[in-house]
Amino acid sequence: MAGSELRERRRSVENARARGEAPVAEIGESWTRCRRTVDPAATAAPVDVEPEEVRQRWEASPIRRSAVGLEEQLTLAAEAGDLVAAVTDQDGRILWSAGGRTMRRVAESVGFVPGGRWHETSDGNNALGLALRRGR
């Protein structure tokens, strides 16, 4: 999703809130927390580690060791469906991803790439950050 699309989506959400259409409590609480730590003008998640460090983290990851053989299947499924599949560590940093050409470009434009940090405190309200917060 491009920056202009993100801004439009934000306006839509803000307009809904102005009309009294409250989000699910869990989402509203996340927005409140994010206001303290996230730059509202940011259009991409921070990618602040070197590729070699990401590779080392992925190689050492317990998920990687248990997913041997699944990477190829996930890659094929992601490419065939033109979607993005990703695995993060316990801190919300993407360690591995694969995707179809179109969605991979979109993912790259918002920092949804290996090394990208998708924790609620660094990138705002998002599914990965919320899952981490809830322990799911």
Show which residues each predicted segment covers.
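Intrinsically disordered, low-complexity terminal regulatory regions
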Residues: 1-121, 126-130, 134-136
